[in-house]
């Protein structure tokens, strides 16, 4: 098994172990507070850190160059994503997108000529004659596991292990319910404290969601946080409760943005006339005799 296949296998194993998390979240009481933390472009951030580079301004992809250009990039640095490159592209898509960007840069460059290259986004911003370049880093799964373990131990400084659920190599759920009183902090303040420790000690930026159950904190992180302006460290923290979820996300589309709603399931829902979470919520209120009811879900 090569390095990329090892990474895919580990991610699959994490997902198998966590299929019950969504079901457990619905039983949480309203006085609970949960936190989800996702490490931003984790593999790419680790590779930048190992090179002494800042992932927020370094253009880097994690991919196995020994394979063809159809190989999937395991990660794209935050800086490179700013140019419109998605998080899990194939390598040839990165190549094509960078070529397109450099054609545009050449059109506005002095004398319509790019005289050098740079993988530093800050240099590219101020020097129009530079061509966009990027680093291709070979996957190192053992190294990523070591960083993930180090970050887990940072969380353990603040939270007991029984209140931390490791969802994947770069994502955790934390029950914060009893810790705000212990530390005298709001959920946002406690989340930021842990995330800043992670950043300073590992060079990895994180995004977080806070909610009254596991589902809401996950959706806050996955959807709401993306629309927030990052702070100076690239961090985003969003919060949802049942009321704000209904207010902000009942009409959100596409459904595939929501946790565990894949394209196949979304298609079946749309075939039934259900296009939003609001549609689904109203459907669940239907009586057995009604055309829309909980059974059809």
Task: Enumerate the language-model features and the residues they cover.
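Gly/Gly-Pro- and Ser/Thr-rich, intrinsically disordered tail segments characteristic of DNA damage-repair
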Residues: 1-297
